[in-house]
């Protein structure tokens, strides 16, 4: 079993899945693939693969994430807007610990009550503050 850090889950699985959902939602709003590709900073071929379920299929995003993306697409006017919206969505995934759900899926053997990512960081910050 390969060790995967939560950040790797984000980079390899979550960011592509979130981009894919942005592409789907933007297409539903009537945007053309060329425009979607420009906004997301990917190729038109990547958008085609997202829309045809040939890319970013390893993760099915939770309904709450899809809902957030739907709302986000209405605010997006430029690539920098997409970056900001994706960062907010990733932060939400971390804050709500949905990242743990995805981490468990791709790395077997993690205890159900694992808190390493959150507990270690919190205890480390507290130790640093005490110095």
Give the location of each predicted region.
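Short, amphipathic alpha-helical "recognition" segments used to contact nucleic acids or chromatin
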Residues: 15-30
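Short, Lys/Arg-enriched anionic-surface-contact patches
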Residues: 1-19
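Amphipathic alpha-helical segments within well-ordered protein domains
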Residues: 24, 48, 70-74
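DNA major-groove recognition helix of helix-turn-helix
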Residues: 51-52
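Short Lys/Arg-enriched helix C-cap and helix-to-coil transition segments
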Residues: 57-74
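Helix-turn-helix/homeodomain-like alpha-helical modules used for DNA recognition
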Residues: 71-131
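Short alpha-helical "recognition helix" segments of helix-turn-helix
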Residues: 32-39, 47
